[in-house]
């Protein structure tokens, strides 16, 4: 399949085709339909299986699936207890949702490069990008949502007045340094969603690109490279989901604290 695409448009055409989203609309209102579909679908998969595990929870001996879900829940709960120092019942469910959702989106990278795009082509879709976290719109959508939660809880917990004073008089308390504090804190706040979104996007985009490059090689070379990279990539997709979750917890913990 990679050879056919290579012959049709060259290596560059093959790479561009796999990294081009299925879009609808123009300009600012362009929607990446494939990103929206796979994001919502994977979110629904997470909700379905975790709800099923919760409904099947019993006081007796749990099954393998329930053990697996409980292990993930306990792992996330431990991270929240270690990193979040406020009191908020939303943080643990939010952290669990972020970890599982981001992991599932990242895990789409482990599917054969041409599998779903060829299925899409068979039903008339010119483009189909199947890894939502390789779309900057998706990663920034999540990181900006976290940013809004940071602002919301900063205002709710500290109050507008205290939040403004903290913004203007931290880290330097002298009134003459208010402009410097304002600039410093603005950059610090804006850097959180930017770094959160770019980190996830950059790592997953690079991983997907390597899989695509491997698919361009002769078929007899591909297994020797794709299998080791896939095994290593399992660590990457898990680590990126973990980092996104932990940083979200830390940022929200800071929003609950006063300087």
From Swiss-Prot:
**Which GO MF terms does the UniProt record name?**
proton-transporting ATP synthase activity, rotational mechanism
Q: Does the keyword Repeat apply?
A: no
Which coarse location class describes where this protein primarily resides? membrane
| Cystine pairings recorded for this chain | none
Q: Which PROSITE patterns match?
A: ATPASE_A
Where is the protein localized? Cell inner membrane
This protein's GO CC annotations: plasma membrane; proton-transporting ATP synthase complex
Keyword Chaperone attached: no
Q: State the annotated membrane topology for this chain.
A: Multi-pass membrane protein
Which keywords fit this entry according to its UniProt record? ATP synthesis, Cell inner membrane, Cell membrane, CF(0), Hydrogen ion transport, Ion transport, Membrane, Transmembrane, Transmembrane helix, Transport
Q: Which domain of life is it from?
A: Bacteria
Q: Which residues cross the membrane?
A: 30-50, 90-110, 135-155, 209-229, 230-250
What InterPro entries does the record point to? Answer: ATP_syn_F0_a_bact/chloroplast (IPR045082), ATP_synth_F0_asu (IPR000568), ATP_synth_F0_asu_AS (IPR023011), F0_ATP_A_sf (IPR035908)
A Pfam family per the record: ATP-synt_A
Purpose of the protein: Key component of the proton channel; it plays a direct role in the translocation of protons across the membrane.
**Which NCBIfam families does this entry report, sorted A to Z?**
ATP_synt_6_or_A, PRK05815.1-1
* Name of the molecule in the record: ATP synthase subunit a 1
Originating organism = Methylococcus capsulatus (strain ATCC 33009 / NCIMB 11132 / Bath)
Query: Gene encoding this chain?
Result: atpB1
């Amino acid at each position: 399949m990679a050879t056919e695409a290579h012959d049709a448009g060259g290596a560059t055409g093959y790479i561009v085709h796999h990294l081009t989203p299925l879009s609808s609309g123009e300009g600012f209102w362009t929607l990446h339909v494939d990103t929206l579909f796979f994001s919502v679908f994977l979110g629904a998969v997470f909700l379905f299986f975790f709800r099923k595990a919760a409904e099947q929870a019993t006081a007796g001996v749990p099954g393998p699936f329930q053990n697996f879900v409980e292990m993930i829940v306990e792992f996330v709960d431990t991270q929240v207890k270690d990193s979040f120092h406020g009191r908020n019942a939303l943080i643990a469910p939010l952290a669990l949702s972020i970890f599982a959702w981001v992991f599932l989106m990242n895990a789409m990278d482990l599917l054969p490069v041409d599998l779903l795009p060829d299925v899409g082509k068979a039903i008339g879709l010119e483009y189909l990008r199947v890894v939502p976290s390789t779309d900057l719109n998706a990663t920034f959508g999540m990181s900006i949502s976290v940013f809004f939660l940071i602002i919301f809880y900063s205002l709710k917990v500290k109050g507008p007045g205290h939040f403004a004073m903290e913004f203007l008089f931290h880290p330097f308390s002298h009134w003459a340094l208010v402009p410097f504090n304002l600039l410093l804190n603005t950059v610090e706040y804006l850097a959180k969603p930017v770094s959160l979104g770019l980190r996830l996007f950059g790592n997953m985009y690079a991983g997907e690109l390597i899989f695509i490059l491997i698919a361009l090689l002769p078929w007899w070379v591909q297994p020797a490279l794709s299998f080791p990279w896939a095994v290593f990539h399992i660590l990457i997709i898990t680590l990126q989901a973990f980092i996104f979750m932990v940083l979200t917890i830390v940022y929200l913990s800071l929003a609950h604290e006063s300087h």
